[in-house]
């Protein structure tokens, strides 16, 4: 709309105000769908005059539709009215939107802060959230993302079901949009009588509270009850209750093959595992102390490896290795910013790329940094793609910042020149048959020669420009979902072999799983979908609960969302959902045969090895189930 209409409804498009000792400046975007009633000269003259009238040294925070610069110096320029260096006026932060992403970084002495939509999923599948900034008298601030639509949500993730006796892990996810949690207390009862009363849990993240429940041998075989009370800063209370039974025998994870990439391998083909005995028992859970987003857990030589996000730039971004036997943290390696998508292992090195475009190579045994690179990606949007590794090479980045490196040395082998970066893209690179398949959100799906980096093909029709999901490679074919269709492509050429339109939105980060009879994938609003692999007709749908946090672009309530990729063991497929539950589903009829609720959304895919199933939640908890 025109600025005249905007101003007639909302008031001026550029203005300033003081709050405390800080001067806040609201500036307009330079243009839009219609020519605005102001010019860059008008705004620059006004801005110069405005800042000339504040006390020297006053902290300044500027709001605008978009980021002014990728550089460390913030210079507001005009056509004929000169320019003004905002760094000379004690600029503390530049707060912007436009990209529909959650991304915070430091540019020199200035923080740039972007927040996605508070009522719907972001363009890059960012969480629905609003940002609270706590600013002190010096203009220094802390940031806090608050996730919308949650009203005193509480769930006991552990203990639940059948547990091994001894000291039990207590994990509670609790969240409310309007108020942080002040404290969480638990009471354990046997036959209605307290065994332990009003014990305090420790806060691990904005979602999760954790502790331990010591139980003597006399409670073995008895059904016990855990009651939890959470008190919020605004005085509200939430309560939950869980029944569980202690047994003397411990469930011991016995790992087999490594799970080194998304869906187990670089082709993301999710090979079938041996059946898991149901019901699965929680062998252990541990919280890493930071939120876990789309970085699906890996299993490598007895270790579980995950990586965290740092949406508020408080130093929370790390890669972690946990002992697969008991969940203890073996090492953590700090990174500069959020790691938002798939990590991978090759040559006993784990690779991760952060939102600022840094690629990290970390020794899986020691957690020591082997090497790192600044990828030549654009300053915006944030790098949230998943990487892939295989046969001694790691592939990372996106657009003309997509590169191949020797895994052990970091030597660059090639850099993509054939296609450019898109919007924030949640798909993970797929590797196989000397082909690297990548995507750029709102642009296309691309095939590059894995040895040379040469662009071989691009496809964008019929919704393939929406690049949320990653393709699975089976033989000479690619299987993927996009927008409102399921596709089979010829991998070598990108030729569409099959396109099946679907009556629902599948713009999710879910790689299709091929079983012996089904093709199974997540959806934005209908839960898990299975097509008959011969006829491609819908075989079943398995509904799940409403997403605790919305992530699919422009999705709102109600949305039974699955942003993850399913895996299979025997006749059961396992999948994690945005409703905070991991499900075991009979692949023949779509019926739920096992589930475990955590109370925090699950954006990372399940990992399988031997008798163990590993999954993580957004609250920072990692869970290992086995039987």
What are these regions (language model features)?
Residues 266, 285-300, 308-317, 330-344, ...:
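Extracytoplasmic beta-rich repeat domains
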Residues 139-171, 175:
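Short, compositionally biased P/S/T/A/G/V-rich stretches that sit at domain boundaries
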Residues 252-282:
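Blade/loop signatures of beta-propeller domains
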Residues 323-326, 363-367, 406-410, 449-453, ...:
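Short loop/turn segments that connect beta-strands within beta-propeller blades
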Residues 1-59, 78-93, 101-144:
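Extended active-site neighborhood of metal-dependent phosphoesterases/phosphodiesterases
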Residues 203-214:
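Aromatic sugar-binding surface patches on proteins
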